[in-house]
Structures are given as C-alpha cells and as structure tokens.
Amino acid sequence: MAAHKKSHIRIFFVSVMIILSLFSGFGEGQTYINYNGMKGDIIPGCSSKNPKECVKIPAYSYNRGCEISTRCQRQQHSSSS
C-alpha cells in the first residue's frame, strides 16, 4: 500500500513539474530593445515646424547669491596692466 501511495505522489510531482515548465516560457520578454523604448527623451511637439518647443530649460541655473562678508555688494575688480 505504501508503494502505491508513493507512486501517486511521484506522478503528481512529475505532472506539476511538466505543467510549470510549459508555463515558464509564456512570460519571456523581448531579447532586444526596440526603437519605441529609445524614444523616451523626445519632447512632444518638437519638430521643424515648431522649433521653439525643442529648447530645454536648464534644471538649475547657478546664482551665487549674497555674501555676508561683502554685505551683498559686488566688488569691482580693476584690471591693471
């Protein structure tokens, strides 16, 4: 009786492994990057008909600000030759 029960368990596990191996191939992705994936940085509306939309605004424009030591006054550097 124990040998008969072990054979049922063995058949069950083999059938589960076969089913899982069949389903494992369905989720595979593409093996290459297509051109649609590389177009993510294109600005919509940027074309030769509308060139002003192609200009990107810088993310950080440097501003030195006010220094306490100069009391917010810029010193004029004279160039002596």
Curated annotation (Swiss-Prot):
Please provide the record's keywords in A-Z order. Answer: Disulfide bond, Hormone, Secreted, Signal
Q: List the disulfide bonds.
A: C46-C54, C66-C72
Instruction: Enumerate the GO terms in the molecular function aspect.
Output: hormone activity
Which GO biological-process labels does this protein carry? calcium-mediated signaling; cell-cell signaling; regulation of growth
Where is the protein localized? Secreted
Tell me the InterPro entries matching this sequence.
Answer: RALF
- Tell me the Pfam families matching this sequence: RALF
Q: Where is the signal peptide?
A: 1-29
Q: Which GO terms describe its cellular component?
A: apoplast
**PANTHER family recorded for this chain?**
PROTEIN RALF-LIKE 15-RELATED, PROTEIN RALF-LIKE 16-RELATED
| Record function comment | Cell signaling peptide that may regulate plant stress, growth, and development. Mediates a rapid alkalinization of extracellular space by mediating a transient increase in the cytoplasmic Ca(2+) concentration leading to a calcium-dependent signaling events through a cell surface receptor and a concomitant activation of some intracellular mitogen-activated protein kinases.
Q: Member of which family?
A: Belongs to the plant rapid alkalinization factor (RALF) family.
Q: What is this protein called?
A: Protein RALF-like 6
Q: Lineage, please?
A: Eukaryota, Viridiplantae, Streptophyta, Embryophyta, Tracheophyta
